[in-house]
C-alpha cells in the first residue's frame, strides 16, 4: 500500500508556533493520514519500495529533508529539496493566511470568502511546485501535495 502511515515534523525552531499555525499543522496531519497517496519510484535498477511509509519532514542546512522509513522503521530513503523554489509561495501563503485569520474575526462572510479563494489559489500553487520538485523522487496526488505543502509551510515558518 503506497501511502504515508505516520508523519513527524522535525521542528527545531526555538519559537513556538502560533495557535493558528499549530491548528493548521494538526489539521494537515490528520487529513494526510486519513487519505494520501505516496509512492517511491524504482531507482538504480531496484524495485520500488513498498509502503506504507513513515515520513519525517525537516529542514537541515537550508534544505527540506524527506526521511522515509518503512512501517517497521527501516530506512527506505532520504532526499533533500532546495527551499528556494518554495520561498515566495510560502511567504505569499502566510501573508494571505494572516489576512484570512484577521478577516474571520471582523469581516462579513462575502469578504472572507474572497480571501479564502485567494488562499486556496496560493495553496494550489504551492502544491504544484511541490509536485514538480518531487518528480523522480516520490509520486503524490494533488491532495497529498496540498497537505504536505501545509506542513512545509509550518516547518518553514513555525
From Swiss-Prot:
This protein's source sits in the domain of life called Bacteria
**InterPro entries for the chain:** UCP032146
Can you tell me which family this protein belongs to?
Answer: Belongs to the UPF0262 family.
Q: What is this protein called?
A: UPF0262 protein RHOS4_22360
Q: What is the lineage of its organism?
A: Bacteria, Pseudomonadati, Pseudomonadota, Alphaproteobacteria, Rhodobacterales
